Amino acid sequence: MTRSRRRFLKLTIGAELRRQLVTSVRVRRGPYNDNVDFPPVVRKAHSVRPIGVGIGDRGYDSERNHELLREELHAMSMIPPRMKDVALCRTEGLYRKEMKRRFSERVYHQRAKDETIFSVVKRTMGDEMRSVRTKGLNNEIRVRMIAYNAMRVASSFVGGFLQSQFS
């Protein structure tokens, strides 16, 4: 008897990191290759707000993703090389080689804010999904992201209002 592999939800987001707002969302059933979701999420995020630096984890390291960010969207890419121990001469791709030479931990560390977004959503709204069907699950996640953005905007507005009142 073979066991079917349990499929889970995989969420890819594009976020504006200065204010920690979600600008684009892609939901799918996992496990799945991350590179498939990268172009639509990045293009949608860029249409909402132009990207200055595109930051992704090792799963997004491919020459195509670097080309998309740099040539099409005119943004800097900051994606760490998948195999950092491989010699530079054996790394394929112009932008991947450049990333190996000029990778900045300080800039890449901003990616932790994406994880903060996931953490805040799970803490404030719970990590259990109430929907059963895939379409309902996808909609539930999208609504959670909208609610998260509304919460962030409202708290920054109220926080700014209170600071101006008591300064």
What are these regions (language model features)?
Residues 33-37, 89-90, 166:
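A short, polar/proline- and glycine-enriched secondary-structure boundary/capping micro-motif
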